[in-house]
A protein has these predicted regions:
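Hydrophobic core of transmembrane alpha-helices in multi-pass small-molecule transporters
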Residues: 23, 103-121, 311-323
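Short amphipathic helix-loop junctions that connect adjacent transmembrane helices
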Residues: 34-48, 240-256, 367
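Interfacial helix-cap and linker-helix signal at transmembrane-aqueous boundaries
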Residues: 39-40, 71-72, 161-166, 246-247, ...
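Helix-to-loop junctions at the C-terminal end of transmembrane segments
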Residues: 64-77, 163, 271-284, 366-367
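C-terminal ends and interior cores of transmembrane alpha-helices
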Residues: 86-101, 294-306
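Intracellular juxtamembrane helix-capping segments at the cytosolic ends
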Residues: 119-134, 323-337
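Helix-loop-helix hairpin linking two adjacent transmembrane segments in secondary transporters
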Residues: 135, 144-195
Length: 417
């Protein structure tokens, strides 16, 4: 390992590694979302069929995501992350295999496995992002999400290029899964998780359960959770349906549909990279209000337009508006060091639920209202809810404890295997 890297402070190494993990996770997710039209055609799925399969496949992931905070408390971020990396790799490869075999049953099973693995990864990644921000004493959470967005752009381009070159879905998925899975485990061994106190799991698990569950009764946490849910639903709906909506709505090619998704993610990336300056200037509340207005305007332009050019402008506004919503929710949830881990876990859990419900929800609406382009307009509703609760992301006025003390509330990593 590079000596200069090893010479960095522990939390700085963790920051760089987590940026990398977010980035490759974006590549993995979006390299297959760009191939949804091919998967749909190979499995002969209608929008309703695809939505139903994704809904059934989300059940295991939903159970897992709500169990993740307790799993983190018992086993620590490192062990949960490692398990998620292995399960996610297996599920991703199986999605490609099920598509190649033309089996809806195998494809559905693969979605379940992939979702479970993704849930086991999502919560520890977001919890660690909050711990790292607290340790640095400055805003860094948007940078992790910017890395995911940058990886997503690369994944969209990869998927579009693979489609244009006629690369089989199964081959693309196998290569991406193995490379990303290996890099995740390598990052874990290199110091992805900041050391902390012993996991509660080395004692009775019930010791931590009240703290984990009590945040669900906190009014501010619930309202911030509404924002996290709205932001993730907006992003998840675009991820799953935008390329297909453009293909069906404007008779474009799959490759161009993948590039449209790349525009959405590319705009998100730019805003997330430079968004910290906007937050400093406008404040959290002003930044969130502007973000929600832009997202709603862009979504309306895309969903109601008959012009592909205007729709593309709408996609850019939608992506730029969505960009900072979830990072702001995570930052607000971690304002108070005591219990920050539980609140961030709550945000990640709600976001995962939103992402997993977005696909089937849009599929059902698309079947009833003439296709995914118009169905995506339903996302305006949660974005309006996010706009209404924007005032609750304002920083707490109470003094914040030493950031390093926050680490005492987090589980100890288990050595990577």
């Amino acid at each position: 390992m590079n000596r200069a890297f090893l010479a960095l402070a522990v939390h700085e190494r963790a920051r760089l590694l987590l940026i990398g993990v977010f980035g490759i996770s974006g590549v993995m997710a979006f390299s297959w979302l760009a191939r949804i039209p091919s998967i749909r055609d190979q499995l002969s799925l209608t929008p309703a069929d695809l939505g139903l399969i994704l809904l059934v496949g989300s059940i295991g992931a939903l159970v897992t995501v709500f169990s993740s905070p307790a799993l983190l408390a018992r086993f620590g971020s490192a062990r949960v992350f490692a398990t998620g990396a292995l399960v996610n790799t297996a599920g991703f490869m199986l999605i490609g295999a099920g598509t190649a075999m033309g089996s809806r049953w195998i494809f559905g099973l693969a979605i379940v496995i992939n979702g479970i693995g993704g849930s086991l990864l999502t919560v520890p990644m977001n919890v660690e992002s909050a711990r790292i921000e607290q340790a640095h004493g400055r805003s860094v959470i948007p940078h992790f999400h910017a890395a995911f967005s940058a990886g997503a752009v690369g994944g969209s381009i990869l998927g579009a290029a693979a489609s244009s070159a006629g690369v089989p879905v199964w081959l693309q998925f196998a290569v991406v899964a193995l490379v990303v899975g290996g890099l995740r485990l390598a990052a874990l061994r290199a110091g992805l998780v900041i050391p902390g106190p012993a996991p509660v799991g080395r004692g009775p698990v019930d010791q931590k359960a009240p703290a984990l569950m009590s945040v669900w009764r906190e009014p501010r946490a619930i309202l911030i959770g509404v924002l996290a849910f709205a932001a993730a639903l907006s992003e998840g709906a675009a991820n799953n349906w935008l390329s297909l909506a453009f293909v069906d709505g404007f008779a474009s090619t799959e490759a161009f549909g993948g590039l449209v998704l790349g525009v959405f993610i590319g705009t998100m990336t730019i805003v997330r990279v430079f968004g910290s300056r906007a937050i400093d200037g406008l404040g959290r509340v002003g930044s969130l209000q502007l973000s929600c207005v832009l997202a709603i305007a862009g979504l309306a332009a895309f969903g109601l337009s008959g012009s592909p050019q205007l729709a593309l402008v709408g996609v850019a506004l939608w992506g730029g508006g969505t960009a900072l919503c979830f990072p702001l929710a995570v930052a607000a949830a971690s304002d108070e060091p005591l219990g920050a881990q539980a609140r961030v876990s709550m945000m990640a859990s709600l976001a995962s639920v939103a992402v997993m419900t977005a696909a089937p929800l849009i599929g059902v609406v698309a079947a009833a209202f003439g296709g995914p382009q118009h169905a995506l307009l339903i996302v305006v509703v949660p974005l309006l809810a996010g706009l209404l609760v924007a005032g609750h992301v304002a920083p707490l006025l109470a003094p914040v404890a030493d950031p390093l003390l926050v680490l005492a509330d987090a589980p100890d990593p288990v050595p990577a295997v």
